[in-house]
């Protein structure tokens, strides 16, 4: 949302002429109450999935990732196929939910939907760059589903390499219910994993900031230097590495990845 004070709501989806595989939502000003600067945001819907189901196209998956921005830990991607008859209530973009609500919905999604999780390790991120590593993990998650979907909706601007049809939806975690479910699975899986990494590498506060570059984390990096779970080519990590390890260190090979794909942490 811009800082101009105008509020928007989704009107309808259109195909972006610049990127035919990408769906962009046309927007129009939404009414606001006088003197109010915040309005309720409509939750994601199941209409795209339902439209495909009516045409006989099923399974339909949504996929999303968590952890592009942190300085440490993997990118975690999830793919979810919701059961149209057992959709958990309250699904939304994981960023709009409290941690407790995410945990609650995580368990409900796992109990009612088909899902898969994939991990792109810091070593892969350093080798391939964060975007390519994220797209790789998203594709791995889709192909790890119990049944290959016939159509996939992915959050963002970029389609992923799959053997089925794929649409990229900008802001998809707030628009498409299956993507919202995937955002919850990815976020909770990654948060749980970072708490485990905090036990493996104490002192960095991974359990608190989940690897993001907050002051607590930057101070620990400066004090302790990078851990084996840090992304060695991210600028703050490079600076800390130069301070603690002045010699040039090689980037670990992808073959040594700690995480590839599998069940989410418990």
From Swiss-Prot:
Which portions of the sequence form the region Disordered?
Answer: 19-38
Gene3D superfamilies (alphabetical):
Ribonuclease H-like superfamily/Ribonuclease H
Q: Which cofactor does it need?
A: Mn(2+); Mg(2+)
Where is a divalent metal cation bound in this sequence? 64-65, 155
Check the record and name the PROSITE patterns matching this protein: RNASE_H_2
Reaction catalysed by this enzyme: Endonucleolytic cleavage to 5'-phosphomonoester
EC no. given is 3.1.26.4
BP-aspect Gene Ontology terms: DNA replication, removal of RNA primer; mismatch repair
Q: Which note does the record give on the cofactor?
A: Manganese or magnesium. Binds 1 divalent metal ion per monomer in the absence of substrate. May bind a second metal ion after substrate binding.
Which superkingdom?
Answer: Bacteria
Compartments, as annotated in UniProt: Cytoplasm
Task: Cite the RNase H type-2 domain residue spans from the record.
Answer: 58-246
Record's keyword terms, sorted: Cytoplasm, Endonuclease, Hydrolase, Manganese, Metal-binding, Nuclease
GO cellular component term, pick one = ribonuclease H2 complex
Any GO molecular function: manganese ion binding
Regarding protein family, the annotation reads: Belongs to the RNase HII family.
Q: Which PANTHER family match?
A: RIBONUCLEASE H2 SUBUNIT A (PTHR10954), RIBONUCLEASE HII (PTHR10954:SF18)
Alphabetized NCBIfam families for the sequence:
PRK00015.1-3
What's this protein's function? Endonuclease that specifically degrades the RNA of RNA-DNA hybrids.
Query: Any idea what this protein is called?
Result: Ribonuclease HII
Which source organism does the UniProt entry give? Rhodopseudomonas palustris (strain BisB18)
């Amino acid at each position: 949302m811009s800082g101009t004070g105008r509020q928007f709501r989704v009107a309808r989806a259109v195909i972006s002429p610049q990127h035919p595989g990408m769906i962009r939502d046309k927007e129009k000003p939404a009414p606001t109450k006088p003197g109010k600067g915040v309005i309720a945001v409509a939750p994601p819907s199941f209409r795209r999935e339902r439209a495909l189901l009516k045409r006989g196209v099923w399974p339909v998956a949504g996929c999303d990732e968590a952890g592009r921005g942190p300085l440490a830990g993997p990118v975690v991607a999830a793919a979810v196929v919701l059961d149209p008859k057992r959709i958990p209530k309250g699904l939304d973009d994981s960023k709009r939910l409290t941690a407790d609500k995410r945990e609650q919905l995580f368990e409900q999604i796992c109990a009612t939907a088909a899902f898969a999780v994939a991990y792109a390790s810091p070593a892969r991120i350093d080798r391939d760059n964060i975007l390519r590593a994220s797209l790789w993990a998203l594709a791995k998650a889709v192909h790890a589903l119990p049944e290959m979907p016939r159509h996939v909706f992915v959050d963002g601007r970029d389609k992923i390499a799959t053997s089925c049809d794929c649409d990229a939806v900008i802001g998809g975690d707030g628009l498409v219910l299956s993507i919202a479910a995937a955002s919850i699975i990815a976020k909770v899986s990654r948060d749980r994993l970072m708490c485990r990494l905090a036990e493996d590498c104490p002192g960095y506060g991974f359990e608190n900031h989940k690897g993001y570059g907050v002051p607590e984390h930057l101070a620990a990096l400066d004090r302790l230097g990078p851990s084996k779970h840090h992304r060695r080519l991210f600028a703050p990590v490079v600076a800390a590495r130069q301070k603690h390890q002045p010699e040039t260190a090689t980037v670990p090979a992808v073959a040594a990845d700690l995480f590839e794909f599998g069940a989410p942490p418990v």
